[in-house]
Amino acid sequence: SFGNFSLREPENLTPEIQLNLEKVFRAAQEFAEHPHGWLVMMGTYGCGKTHLAAAIVNYLKGMGDNPVFVVVPDLLDHLRATFSPSSSTSYDDLFNRVKSAPILILDDLGTQSATPWAREKLYQIFNERYNAKLPTVITMSGNLEDLDARIRSRMLDTRVCMIYEILAPSYRGGSTRPARTKRK
C-alpha cells in the first residue's frame, strides 16, 4: 500500500535521490487517484517500482475498480499455456482481458524472452491500449532502448506517457540497506 511504502529517510540517501523517490511516490498516488494515460516507473531491482504498482492496484480495488496486474514474463507463459489441449482458459479470452482491461499494470517489462512471438504479443497489447487510450502502469528495470521500437515509440509519446526513473538503490542489499533486528 502507499501507507507502508518507505521513502527511506533513515538510509541517508542524497537529497537528489530522496526528492526523486518522493516525486515518483506522488506520481503513483496521483495516478491511483486519477488513472489516465500511462505511468512508467524505471529503476534498479528492489528500488520500489513493484511496491508502488501494487499500491496503485490496492488503492483502485479499494475504490471499487478492477485493475489487472500481470508480470510480463508470467503473462507470456500463461498465453503460451493456453495452446495446450488441457488448458481451461482460451487464448483469446486471456489476451483480450489483458489488452482491454480498464486499468492494466504490467510489471517487469523487459525481463521477458525476446522471441518474435513475445515481441509481437506485447506490441499488440501496447498498440491496443495506446489507440484506446487505456490507463496503463508499466514497471521496468532495463532501458527503453532495449524495447521493441514500436513499443518504445508509444512510451515516448509525452501526450500519453509519463516516465519516471527511480534513482534509489535497491533496498534489498548494499551499504544503504537499513539494519534489521535479528529474531531469536
Task: Please state what every model-predicted region is.
Residues T14-E22, K61-S100:
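Short glycine-rich substrate-engagement loop in P-loop NTPases that contacts/grips substrate
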Residues P35-A53:
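Walker A/P-loop nucleotide-binding motif
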Residues N4-L39:
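Pre-Walker A (pre-P-loop) alpha-helix and adjacent loop at the N terminus of AAA/AAA+ ATPase modules
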Residues G37, D65-N66, S100-I103, A132-I138:
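Loop/turn-to-beta-strand initiation segments
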Residues H51-D65:
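P-loop NTPase Walker A phosphate-binding motif
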Residues A28-A32, H78-L104, E120-E128, R150-I151:
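Conserved alpha-helical scaffold flanking the Walker A/P-loop in AAA+ ATPase domains
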